[in-house]
UniProtKB/Swiss-Prot annotation:
This is DNA polymerase IV. The record marks F13 as: Substrate discrimination. Monomer. Pfam families: IMS (PF00817), IMS_C (PF11799), IMS_HHH_1 (PF21999). The keyword Transmembrane helix does not apply. It comes from Shewanella sp. (strain MR-7). CDD domains: PolY_Pol_IV_kappa. It catalyses: DNA(n) + a 2'-deoxyribonucleoside 5'-triphosphate = DNA(n+1) + diphosphate. It is found in: Cytoplasm.
Amino acid sequence: MRKIIHIDMDCYFAAVEMRDFPEYRGKPLAVGGSRVQRGVISTCNYEARKFGVRSAMATGYALKLCPDLILVPGRMQVYKEVSQQIRAIFSRYTELIEPLSLDEAYLDVSDCKLFKGSATLIAEAIRRDILAETGLTASAGVAPIKFLAKVASDLNKPNGQCVIPPDEVPEFVKSLSLRKIPGVGKVTAEKLSSLGLNTCADVQAYPKQELIARFGKFGAVLVERAHGIDDRGISVSRERKSVGVETTLAQDIYTLEQCQQVMPGLIQELSSRLGRSAKGRQIHKQVVKLKFNDFKQTTIEHRSDEVSVVMFYELLSQAMARQEGRGIRLLGVSVGLAESKDTLAPLMVRETKQLDFVF
């Protein structure tokens, strides 16, 4: 059984604006549109939603619902940069990441060994990291299948989490509204309702072949979802440019020796990830990253076409020279990957015999 997490940022664009401009906090705010030009709301905060304002709503109508609505233009470059921060956090826990947009993604953490493999605790850790490093809140859904993870992430918003364990899936889907199933929009929901089909339990009791006759391929998918079946895997379509491992330390550390004690576990996990997601790819650099307790960070890299364990330790020493007495709260190692067309040979590892562990 897989362990799927769906992360959904809370009113993302609006949340970034409230973070950067505290004067907006506690007031109805929407991103997009203008008081003088026609437009559409991209997103709005929860204060605006109390008045009925929603995403994709015409700005003029939103202002009728909430005359005091604050409208701000979108800052897409900022939203993209923060989204990259968030995805970097995801990559600490798994390489199986399927971004759906700037503010949501599926993660398959089935092979993650952190927190003894508990997807619940992993989701909590991801949300903590996002809050600590971006100042934004995220909601999470945890389930053994994708569509239920997405459903679950919406149940305890904002800044909440919902877990649907495998043994609770059959009971959970029975009462689930068909409107919650991806692909069931307003028109389809009305057609289903005209047949007396409003919940998954209704579909379970309905003749499968009749649904397929009425709705075609979607009818078959609907039957599967209504029974808690979703065989879709995580779609990682883009070619990876790097593979890395980071760990946020339980307590700040201060010495090179303490950092060296953390390195073997990171390098071992990096080796595993390279084998899973970059087999046969040529590397072109090695990188060590430190984040300090003032949340500033430094990276040191070295161009190389072979993975050298000793080089990671040399880069660590160079990074520590920039410490300036600060505590270290995060340590990471990574390699940059050459494009597939540049792949000349399998990844090679050298100098491991000088160190007493397996790479």
